[in-house]
């Protein structure tokens, strides 16, 4: 197909719609987990530096990501523990966000520490070497 001024915008819209359809699911793989780890480390640093704006953005990202992870594992068999870990970690990210929004960085730090432990606990069960 030759792209012209008329067909190019149509092709872009079709590509965007296809991308949106595929993005509904989440591929829980090493790249996603490394991204989560990076965001959690950034959140920990942002909370320690009392950077409310950056910390809130990281916490929101983790809340959204763990909702997707929970949904992903909820569709699989024999992953009830993974669903529980994802749900608990999502709640901890939400607690951190609430504390950040209240400028309670001590409570946010506690929530982030618990979040990190929750990640490690899940990895002890599910992470493959």
Stretches found by the model and what they are:
Residues 1-10:
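Bacterial N-terminal signal peptides that target proteins for export
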Residues 13-21:
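N-terminal signal peptide c-region/cleavage motif recognized by signal peptidases
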Residues 22-116:
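Extracytoplasmic c-type cytochrome modules immediately beyond a signal peptide or single-pass transmembrane anchor
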Residues 115-127:
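The canonical Cys-X-X-Cys-His
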């Amino acid at each position: 197909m030759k792209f012209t001024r008329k067909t190019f915008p149509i092709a872009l819209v079709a590509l965007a719609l296809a991308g949106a359809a595929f993005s509904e699911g989440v591929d829980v793989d090493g790249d996603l987990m490394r991204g989560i780890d990076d965001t959690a480390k950034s959140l920990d640093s942002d909370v320690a530096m009392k950077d409310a704006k950056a910390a809130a953005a990281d916490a929101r990202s983790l809340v959204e990501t763990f909702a997707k992870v929970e949904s992903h594992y909820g569709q699989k068999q024999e992953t009830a523990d993974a669903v529980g870990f994802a749900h608990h970690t999502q709640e901890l990210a939400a607690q951190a966000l609430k504390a950040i929004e209240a400028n309670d960085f001590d409570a946010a730090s506690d929530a982030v520490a618990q979040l990190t432990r929750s990640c490690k606990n899940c990895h002890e069960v599910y992470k493959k070497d």
